[in-house]
Amino acid sequence: ATETEKTVYLEEDHLGLNEVVVTGSRTARPIKMSPVTTQVLGGKQLVEAGYSNLQQALQQETPGLNIQKVGFGNEISMQGLDARHVLFLMDGERMTGDMAGNLDYERFNLHAIDRIEIVKGASSTLYGSRAAGAVINLITKKTTKPLSIDAGVRYGQMNERNYKNPQPKDFLYMFEKNADRPNLQGWVSAGFKAGKVTSQTDAWYSSSDAFYMYQAENDKKVYTQEANPFLPHDITVVNSSSRPPMGIEGKEHITVSQKLYYDPTDDLSVLVYGSTFFMNTYDLIQDMTFSQARDWTAGAKLTYHVKDWFSVTGSLHADFYDRFKRHERIDTRNKDYESSIWQPRLTITSNYFDGHSLIFGVEHTSDELTSDRFSGNANHDLKTRALKETEYFLQDEWTINPKWMVSAGLRTNFSKAFGFMGMPKIAAKYSPNERWSIRANYSMGYRSPSIKELFFNWDHLGMFMIRGNENMQPEKNNYFSLGAEYSNDRLFLSGTAYGNYFRDKIEGVWRIYDMQYNFEYTNLSKQRLLGLEALLRWHVLDCLTLNGTYSFVNVSKNEGIQVNTTSPHAATASLDYKFTKKNYRLNAVFSASYMGRKKFDVQDRVFVEEDNKSYDAYFRCDLPQYVLCNLSVSQTFYNKVKLTLGVDNIFNYVPKTLGSGITMFNVPATPGTRGWVQLEFMLDDVINSLRKKK
């Protein structure tokens, strides 16, 4: 007899169309089979591209997503909506501790992420309040190997040297030392699989130095007749003195997470998890204090499969977040913020009926906040406010035939504060062949006012008041989208047009009375957002891949006033080159992000000489377009050591306009061109090699 040799060729899924996603439907299915448009970012690819943190990765890779520097920190926006409408999840679970909807994004360890799933549009049917604009679900790693250990370190140029050689005897020694922390990162990711038990542990430390950003010219305000029809003409006011520099805080933080999986039988699986996060924020204000944040999360999840009929999953998730003011010279700190959420959930999923994927769930959310910002005085008295909601959801994904799929769902919400609400959704996917897919979607979203928007009454250093409004109602929106995509072995093209129509939209508006600025929350009547998005992924050669995204959004004005700060145009592009031979890999990535011109209006007061009196009026902010470009080159030796060199902001773009008056405009917080070096070790491969030699 003669032996027949067979050669098997494995083809890499360059475009990621066979990747399994869960966010769009809460059930696992290949991305190309999902009726809901989902963008997937691989965690490994984001690290290889040289991104230092989640913010940088999302801004570069996601069309229409923007993270800018504003007065209170970082502000994220997507498709013309701010962070209050973008729901961040970690393995499908909510987090607490936000400021104006923005979390401490430093909590997210990029090296612990397996993939990021992004679903745009209203997803309130499955995820409830705050999912009216988008859901960003970070899926963390779970090792499949007996042993997996990766470790690395990254060092970057300082943003700015503020103090030279501070001495311990100096009165401001700790302030000066903290302001000039090194730009340093280190991480370890370790996992093992032994029989029915799988463990995954991840730890990440990062520090960065504080720096100043400077405005090239004096403050200027232009009050236009377009925004203020009562004015006799456009009025320009130029400040006689230069604007003080904007201080960008330095940060030092560490996060550690642990997940433990136990699968005693094929029908039963158990997950227990926990994480902790500590962060110090070092500003450039010499007040002998700095901010501290602390977060603990914990939870458990149990899934049981009843034959092939259905699966039952019960889970309990909790998150506890605290913020302190810490003294630099004395070992004391005062708590000024405490937030917690408890979220039990029960879901039942079934594929028993032919062509149908059903999910039913009930969840309860208990949200509690203790802060010194409810009292409205300077005594910093701590008060507690709470919101509780119970929600039910049902969804069916019906595969009618190989070409048609329909998804329909309904979520009901009941809270003591706002009563009963219902949110339907329906999505359809038509695939005439393997290369083309057309998706249409309608969904209703809602967002209940947050505790801050309802109850805040805070005097900000005597500069202005932030006031909540207990009479506000939940905002509602109707989201429509129509998209098409084409793919072959080397090319993926996707385009989506959407409309998002809000009523009773919750916004913060500036009003001036009692001789000071007041920032108040209120329900606007209506707001309309129309947009287009396009995505390209082209495997030009076996070694070369081109990626590109473009986003356009048009936001309606409110009585002729544009309060939305989003740029109509945004785009990203990257070129990825790979070279591989035995025991060596080279990867080079050049990326660019474009942000278009921004024009919006800010409320103020202006003196009109002709009338010899002052009026409430809006001045026009006009911020220029810009491009940020990055380059990274990595080399991997023997699949054990990887060395990466990179340069961020190659062309040294620095914003020239930071704000006007007390208003800080949303600008990129960059000091200019900075280089970095990164070294990674695949320790499990090193250990396996040593074992083989023995």
Where are the language model's segments positioned?
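Short acidic/polar hinge/loop motifs at secondary-structure boundaries
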Residues: E93-K120, L138-K141
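Face-selective signature of the C-terminal outer-membrane beta-barrel domain
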Residues: Q200, S257-M279, A293-F418, K429-S431, ...
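Extracytoplasmic beta-strand/coil segments of soluble accessory domains associated
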Residues: T38, Q55-G97, D114, A134
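Gram-negative outer-membrane beta-barrel transporters
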Residues: G152, T399-V406, Y498-Y501, T522-Q603, ...
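Short, acidic, small-residue-rich periplasmic hinge/interaction motif at the N-terminus
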Residues: T2-V47, A83
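C-terminal beta-signal and adjacent terminal beta-strands/loops
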Residues: Y214, L546, Y594-E609, S634-K694
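Periplasmic-side early beta-strands and strand-to-turn transitions of outer-membrane beta-barrels
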Residues: G152-S291
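Outer-membrane beta-barrel signature, preferentially recognizing the C-terminal barrel domain
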Residues: T289-H305, Y337-E338, R385-L387, S431, ...
